[in-house]
Amino acid sequence: MADLAAELDALDADTAAALRHWGFDRDRLLGWAERLLPGDGASNRVRGEVTPPLPEDIEALPERTSDEGRRLEQLGLEAIRRGELAVVVLAGGMATRMGGVVKALVEIRPGLTFLDARLAEREHWSAVADAPLPLVLMTSYATDDPIRETLGDTLDGRRVDAFTQGVSLRLTPDGHLFRTAENRPSLHATGHGDLPDSIRGAGTLGRLMDEDVRVVWIANLDNLGAAIDPLVLGKHLDGGAPLTVEVVEKVPGDRGGSPFRVDGRPVILESFRVPEDVDEDAVGVFNTNTFLVDAAQLRDLDMDWTWFRVEKSVEGRPAIQFERLIGELTSALRSSFLLVPRSGPDSRFIPAKDHAELDANRNAISARVAHYLTAAEQSRHGP
């Protein structure tokens, strides 16, 4: 890796300053290159005995109108009113899937962005709780400035806050810095698995806990189905596991994470981690990337993260980057897998990864957003 080290030492002053600003770790990249670069996709596959989850590993969310549902909903609502919940929205990444526009600022309908919808949701539940419910955004070097500029004074560091995930540099398959057509190094965000280290390193988690937050709700920016719901929160609190993972019934074409047992432990495995001789279709549910985690467990987390070698096509050429995934939390924290609705008015999975998916799900997303906005308006002005 001597050549790569020399290339890093020779970076121009502006690039080096930007990397320092965003927390680039030179030694970590050199370590990844030495350990992971010589591998291929097979190196990402998990080792050990991998089997489908047991029936008792996955529990369905109770009906809201059942006695149990009403009890759990009340339990969650009381926790919100005590100020014990904070929401962290994953708003980082590379801003590439929506034509170069930061997804938080993409309009769901004219005049209303994903960020607007999350703010309206926060406003509603703050009114219900009669106390500010914290909304925290995990941004990246590519999304942080536009989001902060848009939020302006709304980003007050208490009701609405933000911290950034990590950054690194892409490599060529033979271990040199990948350079763009303009001969610039190619930066990338290092995955949503950065969240635990980044939220702690920024001091954000400590501040939230000082304000009595007990549960951190983690959700993708672009899944507006993953809304605050006292029923889900109550189920998490009642279940006793430090980590709750929302899953939905799998449909053809789903690619991503699902629950498996690895050496007897229930965990989330991404598709690329599942051994080739294991039938993924034997697992009928799919991870929505929505998590509820006990704040104290997140604060005290001490785990050896698995970093993955990911091959991308950048400007039509192969590039290698290294990432970690938030689902790996299940390998360190005892986890409960909660089956939630995928369809209908109570759907908790309405993704919009790109323009095509946004267009396909626009009606469902608009209906959910209308509920947020109506609820927020009623909270401010009365029915």
Question: Language-model segments: which ranges?
Answer:
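A general secondary-structure junction signal
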Residues: 139, 164-166, 339-341
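Catalytic core of tubulin tyrosine ligase-like
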Residues: 208-220, 225-229, 234-382
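Solvent-exposed, flexible loop/coil residues
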Residues: 102, 109-112, 173, 203, ...
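A conserved hydrophobic position in a structured secondary element of the catalytic/binding core
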Residues: 139, 191, 293
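N-terminal glycine-rich phosphate-binding loop and ensuing alpha1 helix
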Residues: 1-161, 169, 178-188, 196, ...
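Conserved beta-loop-beta/alpha segment of the NTase-like Rossmann-fold superfamily
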Residues: 154-255
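Aromatic-residue hotspot detector
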Residues: 148, 162-163, 345-349
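Amphipathic coiled-coil/heptad-repeat helices and related helical stalk/stem segments
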Residues: 72-73, 201, 322
